[in-house]
């Protein structure tokens, strides 16, 4: 287990996330951030971002709810997890262990991007831990990963692929390209947050190795098999989908709304995939209304 300490830009977390601590789980350790009181909301990020993704959403929720965010080993984390399974089922297991260790369940589970796949798996495996679920634009069905990002799987398998990827992410101009973060958000991501997303894989080999294993585990069989369980999850589901998403089609929101027994769609205007970056207030309003039973 290794904690990054070589570059302060890679370890920065926004204070708006709340109190930080290291949570020791059976499968490994990760950082959690806790703010507010009331019914718990657990916010799950996706690939090559971290808890900072929710930095503008948490303050909007924490006046009425307990908001917990975590750094999953998606490549922008600080504690490496060399012995921990980090394929989608393994990541879902970490979320399940977090809910149990923090006594959060049943929780409102919120996922974005590939974090949405993790949430789908948690809901399928342990519905008793999930009171309701919010899926923002995310992978589903055969769209895992989106074709634009298929090169990431190749980078994880060819010699020096991860080193080249990590070196490229040091440069903000590269991050702004469509094949990086460029088309994931409409707004330019705050430099401090962007550095915290991109630099961990660049400065620490152990984090890079974790990301390699995550990328190798991206497989449509996980989303296909999970989709077969949607009909069995009878808790409320909100699909807070971005209207301007370039990777996750609106048709998938409609399909998921039909496949989950108690699901509805709420469109987030003006947002691309990373709606917590583009439209945090609108997303937070939708989550609050849904969690309070008004949506």
Kindly give the residue locations of the regions a language model identified.
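Flexible "cap/lid" subdomain of the alpha/beta-hydrolase fold that forms the substrate-access gate
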Residues: 2-10, 14-21, 30, 68, ...
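Conserved HGGG/HGGXW glycine-rich cap/lid loop of the alpha/beta-hydrolase fold
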Residues: 33-77
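A conserved mid-protein helix/loop that constitutes part of the nucleotide-sugar donor-binding site
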Residues: 52, 251, 281-282
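Alpha-helical elements of the RecA-like P-loop NTPase motor core of helicases
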Residues: 52-55, 209, 285
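Catalytic histidine-centered segment of alpha/beta-hydrolase-like enzymes
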Residues: 271-280, 284
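Conserved alpha/beta-hydrolase "nucleophile elbow" surrounding the catalytic nucleophile
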Residues: 47, 111-113
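A short loop-to-beta-strand scaffold at the N-terminal edge of the catalytic core in hydrolase folds
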Residues: 26-34
